[in-house]
Amino acid sequence: MDESKRKALENALKAIEKEFGKGAVMRLGEMPKQQVDVIPTGSLALDLALGIGGIPRGRIVEIYGPESGGKTTLALTIIAQAQRRGGVAAFVDAEHALDPLYAQRLGVQVEDLLVSQPDTGEQALEIVELLARSGAVDVIVVDSVAALVPRAEIEGEMGDQHVGLQARLMSQALRKLTAVLAKSNTAAIFINQVREKVGVTYGNPETTPGGRALKFYASVRLDVRKSGQPIKVGNEAVGVKVRVKVVKNKLAPPFREAELEIYFGRGLDPVADLVNVAVAAGVIEKAGSWFSYGELRLGQGKEKAAEALRERPELLEEIRTKVLERAGEVVLAAGEDEGE
């Protein structure tokens, strides 16, 4: 760069700094290198699929999928993980359907959870913004985008047309919210449903409510839906297998998948999840229905193997460490033992 251009640039930078404060513009090489701060999901398989060890703080995350697919269970499990690490969590219950007893069984400290049941979409999003601006909340869950009804629609007559109202509401709110979340390092999780476009013959007919803004502003989008047969003990169904696909990821390679097991009444089983990941990584060997770790036979069937590991937390941690070593580039957030 010649001298005249260099001086012009320096003058411009000084003027910007004077007007907007120190650090308003800086060279990328001068910025401190920061590791992505994350909140673990409660599933090692999903943490590895995300590539950063959990959901990113200071960003927007969308969890979407068909009904009863495990979306709210996953969001509540993330809240429980944040609380275990001393964080503060909020749940904006636009659907008015939060079950405190179920949340408690998932590990959520319900007495400390901030809950809001807003009357309108505007109120819900304003609450999210104010909580994020406080800088004191680690994760905010909104359940769900489809239930964020604009004030004009609530006050109008049944059958009135309100084309694009919700999409405009989301677009306006997310424009403001993105910068607020980044400054406060708060993770915002939006749970969303799926709808089918009418008249689509080719391609995927599914879409999500709320317009395109959430798809654009979300750093991570997770497609959560049931996969395969229910989990059975004997003839009794005790849970469901759920496939989570990382559809969008601005922080690591996307399109990775994780299969989770959600048990009725208790949610994710982190030890069974670790067994699945360890088998896939070759740390635990599976021969027929028997599971072995080195020379040690853990048991016949996954439930027996998981039970053996619960009784030996030091072995559980050893296996977890080996899985992470095999994973290589993934660094999980520091936290308590997954099996506790």
UniProtKB/Swiss-Prot annotation:
It comes from the Bacteria. It is found in: Cytoplasm. Transmembrane segments: none annotated. Its main location: cytoplasm. The keyword DNA repair applies. InterPro entries: AAA+_ATPase (IPR003593), DNA_recomb/repair_RecA (IPR013765), DNA_recomb/repair_RecA_CS (IPR020584), P-loop_NTPase (IPR027417), RecA-like_C (IPR049261), RecA-like_N (IPR049428), RecA_ATP-bd (IPR020588), RecA_C_sf (IPR023400). PROSITE patterns: RECA_1, RECA_2, RECA_3. GO terms for molecular function: ATP binding; ATP hydrolysis activity; ATP-dependent DNA damage sensor activity; damaged DNA binding; single-stranded DNA binding. GO terms for cellular component: cytosol. The keyword Transferase does not apply. ATP binds at G65, P66, E67, S68, G69, G70, K71, T72. It holds the Pfam family RecA_C. Keywords: ATP-binding, Cytoplasm, DNA damage, DNA recombination, DNA repair, DNA-binding, Nucleotide-binding, SOS response. SMART domains: AAA. GO terms for biological process: DNA recombination; DNA repair; SOS response. PANTHER family: MITOCHONDRIAL DNA REPAIR PROTEIN RECA HOMOLOG-RELATED, RECA. NCBIfam families: tigrfam_recA. Can catalyze the hydrolysis of ATP in the presence of single-stranded DNA, the ATP-dependent uptake of single-stranded DNA by duplex DNA, and the ATP-dependent hybridization of homologous single-stranded DNAs. It interacts with LexA causing its activation and leading to its autocatalytic cleavage. Belongs to the RecA family. This is Protein RecA.
